[in-house]
Amino acid sequence: MGIERWRRRRPPTRWSLVIRRGIAAGLSAVLFGAAVSGCSSGDDAVAQGGTFEFISPGGQVDIFYDPPQSRGRPGPIRGPDLMDPNRTLSLDDFAEQVVVINVWGQWCGPCRTEMPELQRVYDATRNEGVAFLGIDVRDNNRQAAVDFIVDRKVTFPSIYDPPMRTMIALGARYPTTVIPSTIVLDRSHRVAAVFL
């Protein structure tokens, strides 16, 4: 399954197919690696002796929703822009685009590792109808989160959501307690895949 599946059908060039497949494989590898070392707590977290271990729902770290008609939509995702508190970001800002939502926190080690990789994928796909939207959670120090983004030269927008209110929009159908996690929405903003 690749980005080309979510795009409008037009004859792809050989080069664009190579790029898209490489991006999809790279994004999957980055997200899988981050998922293995996720910064989570909650019902899926287990303490094993003196160590902490994450157990993903059903033992899965990559969840795909196919066929497209079986995909659900998240509720309204909106909140203040991390970089500009006077601006509100919304999923509606990305109409008819594939949207990669990344839930992160500057305090999360795997988030620090994956953010530069996500930026590279964003740079490679933003002109192909793919938008990225970050959701910064559990960061009560806004300036620390801003510094995190500036230091890593991240250019895609993020919602600032310390209490995780935005995650309520995902409801009980999708995992929301794993940080970092990435949710890929198709052009109709249906959940196509979740990477924990």
Ranges and model annotations:
Residues 75, 99, 179-180:
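Short loop/turn microsegments at loop-to-beta-strand junctions
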Residues 3, 85-87, 190:
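Residue-level signal for well-ordered, solvent-exposed loop/turn and beta-edge residues enriched
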Residues 89-112, 118, 132:
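Short active-site neighborhood of thiol/selenol oxidoreductases, capturing the structured segment around
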Residues 81-83, 185-186:
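Short, acidic, Ser/Thr-enriched surface-loop or helix-capping motifs
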Residues 1-80:
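N-terminal targeting signals for export/organelle localization
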Residues 147-155, 161-196:
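Thiol/disulfide oxidoreductase modules built on the thioredoxin-like
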Residues 112-152, 162-169:
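Structural microenvironment flanking redox-active thiols in thiol-disulfide oxidoreductases
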